[in-house]
């Protein structure tokens, strides 16, 4: 990346013909930048057959080297050649080929000396060392974020006089004046009304606490949005749609940089502490990927190869989910199912190791003080019954309906934000939403507490020692019967909690729509789980009371006798949380594993699977896209979804450019164009690459050359090769013919020429073309007829065609 910057910052092209290089690669044009390129322009590219190498030792990567090397200034690699522009897509085939060549070279050298053998071993070990570092950094940052967010969330309600750095729970841990009924009240913890007016009783004290709660929330939100806007605009949002796009090969420079990491970490704490309806789990994936990208720069193997770096980012995403949920296996499956585009077996092992180290690091930090990796770890002891699958499936249906509703409304609101004046005032928008959230949340204790604490409360299986209102049942039993509590009639506290939870459900459903997508770090996992957990707890309590009062009904009498512990409302909350999260994200396997790891209950996998699958079916029936795919399409990222089938009967000739009545395809000839001719084409077009043909008359294809490589090579030749002028002939052939005396030196650029561009015929079905683009990660392919070049299909053309076939606006596939 540093080399790329150097090459870009020192362009100094002759005659001013390249002044528009940085901005000239248009997404709309023929060779659009968001595709993936078959560009074998690097010296480390796919080699010829071994026998050819033996015959000609001068092989140099782009083709067989010429014996006439006088004018071939590219015998030495040029910094910048073969690298990628911002908002460009990598060439997966070339990058993997370069890595194979590098590995082959190291293996061959390791047989020659001990030092080379040591280098080979260190190269093989470097991947595991990098995973270890990513796990350590991700776990440490997650622990720091958890501890800071917990303290700052409690700061809205009061402060610990025994040490301001203690949160509410830690402040009262060592207090000798804590009663069992009020474990959260101790003399060391003072609310703001106690500090300001010396009392915690009465209407005025309530108003003071209310005012301070709203004030702190606005302050935290203002700091978060201001830091994002001023220092790191890429630190906003969840980050998962962009991570998916980057892992598919797209380059967004700075998105995984140092500033983004620092600002995202700080503002994530502020955003979570503000009380907005958002979570830290999605942004933690972004934070972990930032750690992975930054650490990659310490290893040449990953710094110089974009495909290898994306393998590391896939593992980093697994580590991010591992520390977000305390679910290392779920993290690996999340990376495989949801975010990764290319996931070889080696990446699976390394993702597992990175997730393991990250979880171990977080467990060592113990941010919640409960020796668990998450705040809402619970264990259930009562088995579920077959009849309960019916309410579990109902929760799945609710989750699917909620997911589809949320995606449609949130995307509509985000589109309005992008297309109206609303998007120009992100600070005001954040402050308004924060003020509304805080004002509505404070009166209800279930919305006033942090969302993670709310989920923990909803998942909780009530015991004898629980003092929560959700556990305020009437005790009509003999406690000597055993540890398991029978179903009991609900008390006044439970009924009060029910209507408060119903109001909390409405608030969470509505306010999350407007919160996700604002210019602050905002995850969606926790708000979605909260919606489902509230709905599940309400249904669970209803089922529990139904079983208690009507245990003689046919549906209950076979398995639920009076005085037995039949229904676990906390389990319903967990199933509802899984259903709603699945409805929004469309995750299935990874979701079930994450929820299983959260609860430690192997026997509850079937209810979770039933709810997750039902929610996905219902949500898919109402809209095919999950929230992350919908945001990818909204932002116009060039992401070619591998899960969708292309079923239309169109041909390559229907999609390729140029079309009929369009200008002819811009091409370069292999041996008849001058430097000035090429410079003119580059300055007058915005294509990011050009086919090279034998001649304009024959249109026989020779290869493909990238615009960026051309510019850097010509610039370098003018600086380092004497006599290269505008009238110098550019050769892409293996041998340059003898030139008359006194003619300017020729410029040989064969080494930047991709000699094996991917081609299809004009009658190739588009379903095959789309499959090729997906599976090979192509950036473009050339279309031929009887060996003659006809046109070109880029990744952008494929995406536009898919949108057009789906009756969508093809111009929406424009990255902005």
Curated annotation (Swiss-Prot):
Post-translational modification remark: Ubiquitinated by NEDD4L in the presence of albumin; which promotes endocytosis and proteasomal degradation.
Reactions listed under catalytic activity: 2 chloride(in) + H(+)(out) = 2 chloride(out) + H(+)(in)
Transmembrane segments: 125-162, 208-231, 256-275, 281-300, 348-366, 389-414, 422-442, 498-518, 523-542, 605-622
Annotated site location: Mediates proton transfer from the protein to the inner aqueous phase: 338
Coiled coil segments of this chain: none
Binding, ATP: 666, 687-689, 794-797
InterPro entries, alphabetized: CBS_dom, CBS_dom_sf, Cl-channel_core, Cl_channel-5, ClC
Subcellular location: Golgi apparatus membrane; Endosome membrane; Cell membrane
Subunit annotation: Interacts with NEDD4 and NEDD4L.
Function as written in the Swiss-Prot or TrEMBL entry: Proton-coupled chloride transporter. Functions as antiport system and exchanges chloride ions against protons. Important for normal acidification of the endosome lumen. May play an important role in renal tubular function. The CLC channel family contains both chloride channels and proton-coupled anion transporters that exchange chloride or another anion for protons. The absence of conserved gating glutamate residues is typical for family members that function as channels.
UniProt record similarity statement: Belongs to the chloride channel (TC 2.A.49) family. ClC-5/CLCN5 subfamily.
Family matches, as PANTHER family: CHLORIDE CHANNEL PROTEIN, H(+)_CL(-) EXCHANGE TRANSPORTER 5
The name this protein goes by in its record: H(+)/Cl(-) exchange transporter 5
